[in-house]
Amino acid sequence: MPTVERQVASVAEMEALGAKLAAQVGNVRLVNIHGPLGAGKTTLVRGMLRGLGHAGAVKSPTFTLVEPYSFGNLHFYHFDLYRLNDPGELEFLGMRDYLDGNGVCVVEWAERAQGVLPSPDVDIMIEPTETGRMVRIMTLTPQGNVLLKALT
């Protein structure tokens, strides 16, 4: 599985990485983002949204579970499953409709829906380090590989 690693030292660098990913995000359906609390998952998503042209506030959908955005024909759904008690709750949320529709789903805390979510196109792990964050981006599909090429 193709993987790219990036050391990120600041919020601005994390947002810039997200903006680079946004250049090809329309080619994928599911991006999972993992990392501990405060790792920078929402910051990365904010960078993606800024890269797509969103100028407004970007909040983590911790309590609403999903925050939708639209950019012309591209629908972008930002999920935060931190407060998900049971993966079965995703059925009530209409997760299948989001995944089967014309859009990209970016999911923080995807591990909380293990066994319910399909395999992602891109899997991102953010780990705190002494000098910032290590971001590992792994692709699992040909569509994910296209996104990864935006970083090389």
Which residues does each PLM region occupy?
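Conserved lysine of the Walker
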Residues: 41
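P-loop (Walker A) phosphate-binding loop of NTP-binding proteins
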Residues: 34-36
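N-terminal pre-Walker A segment at the start of P-loop NTPase domains
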Residues: 1-18
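Phosphate-binding P-loop
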Residues: 21-28
